């Protein structure tokens, strides 16, 4: 079974990967236990259901990702640099997963949210909360860039919503078409929406 001490962690890591590379509905508890090398009885020691595991896993993954965003979007980083770093980060992550799995995976939260929005209200609420927090990082950078006279965006919240929705839509299309070029197009579109120079990323 592997060490009981890290079984809970392995279960959470496993469901995140299986949901992202596949779907929430197609993944069974047996699938999760097999890939995580954890016995089914141990699963129920830690979690009451697949939904409970997914909630815990999303929360943990968000805490980890939030640390990366805190660094990327630190107020000590110039606002346009924050946005460029984020563009580069998104492309890098999608490129790495394409190399690893053969597929562009897009945004795990959007894919999962679209799938379970009418079926798992607690999961749906968690996803909405995380997406709202992610959008706030863009909003803060846009607000600071406008205040510095670097872009014209007097309504930072509205601009952030537009930008966030555009980028997530592009990532979803990239997943559907399995085309990394669409992720790069999202970077170009982001820069056009903000009126800033496009960062150079590896193709």
Range-by-range predicted roles:
Residues 93-97, 118-119, 144, 164-181, ...:
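Amphipathic C-terminal alpha-helical segment
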Residues 81, 85, 104, 120-146:
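Amphipathic alpha-helical packing segments from all-alpha helical-bundle domains
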Residues 105-111, 154-173, 189-192:
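Hydrophobic alpha-helical segments that form the core
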Residues 56, 70-105, 160-163:
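Hydrophobic alpha-helical connector segments
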Residues 1-6, 152, 200-203:
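N-terminal intrinsically disordered/low-complexity leader segments
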Residues 98-122:
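Amphipathic alpha-helical segments used for helix-helix packing
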Residues 10, 18-60:
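Helix-turn-helix
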């Amino acid at each position: 079974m592997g060490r009981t001490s890290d079984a809970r962690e392995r279960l959470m890591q496993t469901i995140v990967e299986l949901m992202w590379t596949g779907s929430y509905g197609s993944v069974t508890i047996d699938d999760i236990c097999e890939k995580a090398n954890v016995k089914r009885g141990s699963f129920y020691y830690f979690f009451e259901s697949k939904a409970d595991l997914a909630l815990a896993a999303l929360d943990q993954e968000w805490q980890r990702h939030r640390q990366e965003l805190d660094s990327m979007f630190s107020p000590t980083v110039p606002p346009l640099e924050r946005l460029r770093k984020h563009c580069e980060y998104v492309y890098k992550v999608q490129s790495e997963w394409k190399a690893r799995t053969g597929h562009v995976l897009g945004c795990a939260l959007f894919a999962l949210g679209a799938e379970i929005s009418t079926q798992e209200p607690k999961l749906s609420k968690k996803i909405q909360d995380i997406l709202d927090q992610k959008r706030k990082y863009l909003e803060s950078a846009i607000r600071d860039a406008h205040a510095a006279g670097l872009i014209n965006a007097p309504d930072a919240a509205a601009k952030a919503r537009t930008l966030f929705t555009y980028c997530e839509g592009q990532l979803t299309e990239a997943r559907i078409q399995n085309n990394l070029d669409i992720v790069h197009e999202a970077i170009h579109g982001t820069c056009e929406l903000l009126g800033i120079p496009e960062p150079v990323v590896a193709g």
